[in-house]
Regions:
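Glycine-rich phosphate/pyrophosphate-binding beta-alpha loops
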Residues: 151, 155, 211-225, 294
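Gly/Ser/Thr-rich active-site loops/lids in small-molecule metabolic enzymes
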Residues: 167-176, 226-246
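A generic structural signal for short beta-strands and their flanking turns/coil linkers
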Residues: 189-191, 206-208, 231-236, 276
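Catalytic core of DAGKc-family lipid kinases
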Residues: 19-21, 27, 53, 95-208
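Short acidic/glycine-rich loop or secondary-structure boundary segments that cap or lie
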Residues: 155-158, 203-205, 217-221, 245-249
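ATP/nucleoside-binding phosphotransfer catalytic cores, i.e., glycine-rich phosphate-binding loops
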Residues: 197-199, 229, 239-316
Length: 316
């Protein structure tokens, strides 16, 4: 049986086009050489190419154009980078039934993949190249997309800061998120906005932070949506009401563990819902983070597109 399974996978790879979208500036170092080495070791990948975009948006544009020109070609796209690269790849793949995607993790943020396995597993090219396909949800926020999470309030302040320092010599790489959190703690503890989940008003016009998620993690280690199922068509909405800086560290501890939803100490502080649609009404210069990518809009409508993405995850 093992032989036939391996042979079937070989035939699948033979007829499929494999395109590696390599973000040459993800994290602090490029993963281009690692990708080339992984492909050279695997003789089953006869039809492939490597694409290195000049800018982040080039990923999405390239994928859309390729799929429009090859509507009958079964194609798998590999997001070689972090959450931002995965976001751009997913934004190009969505709506194309002949396309699938996966992630070769190599960036400063790799939150979505933690739904399936740890970072090291998604850095193992051999495991990723021969993974199992799943149909997963993706959310549409106005005219853009998020695979993992749409988050705002303190989270958006942190994401903005993170984008500025992620490639800094000292503060970049794995340390950029903790430094960004400190900046958010000092400047972004209260945001004016109103949130609706399937028409239900969740707050009185102010929040500390809010995540709308299909994945489970944000910020590298914060388990914001421990009950999430990324294929059920429902968004996990976790809204934290304004709180003092003194109380905030106690919340963060449970937020990291993923125990915040069931902790009685924060019962009156956290609003949790599952919804198909979330509407966010903010003010001037209001922004949200879409998988770490910043979008500004005064009104944002987030709809979940159930099982609209074919995502390949390593078998663990």
């Amino acid at each position: 049986m093992a032989f036939f399974s391996i042979f079937a996978k070989y035939l699948e790879n033979e007829k499929m086009k494999h395109i590696f979208m390599v973000n040459t500036v993800a994290g602090k170092h490029s993963c281009l050489n690692e990708v080339k080495e992984a492909i050279s070791r695997d003789t089953s990948f006869s039809d492939y190419e490597i694409y290195t975009p000049e800018s982040a948006s080039d990923n999405t544009d390239f994928i859309k154009k390729y799929l429009e020109e090859h509507p009958n070609q079964e194609t798998r796209f590999y997001a070689c980078g972090g959450d931002g690269t995965a976001n751009k790849v997913a934004s190009g793949v969505v709506g194309h039934p002949n396309a699938s995607m996966t992630v070769l993790a190599h960036g400063s943020g790799n939150d979505y993949i933690k739904y399936y396995a740890d970072l090291e597993t998604f850095q193992d090219a051999d495991k990723v190249l021969h993974g199992e396909e799943h149909r997963v949800d993706i959310m549409k926020a106005n005219d853009r997309y998020a695979l993992n999470a749409t988050h705002f309030g303190l989270d958006a302040v942190v994401a903005k800061a993170m984008n500025k320092i992620r490639r800094h010599t000292i503060f970049g790489g794995k340390m950029c998120y903790p430094f960004a959190v400190v900046w958010g703690f000092l400047t972004g503890m209260r945001t004016k906005c109103t949130v609706y989940a399937d028409g239900e008003k969740l707050n009185d016009g102010k929040i500390c932070l809010c995540t709308v998620a299909n994945g489970k993690y944000v910020g590298g280690s914060y388990k914001c949506a421990p009950k999430s199922k990324n294929d059920d068509g429902l968004l996990e909405v976790c809204l934290v009401k304004p709180l003092s800086r003194f109380r905030f560290p106690f919340l963060i501890k449970t937020y990291t563990e993923g125990s915040h939803l069931d902790n009685p100490k924060f019962k009156n502080l956290i609003v949790y819902r599952r919804a198909k649609q979330v509407v966010i009404e903010g003010g001037k210069n209001f922004c949200v983070s879409l998988d770490g990518e910043i979008m500004e809009a005064q009104r944002i409508v987030v709809d979940n597109m159930q099982q609209a993405i074919r995502f390949v995850a390593p078998t663990v």
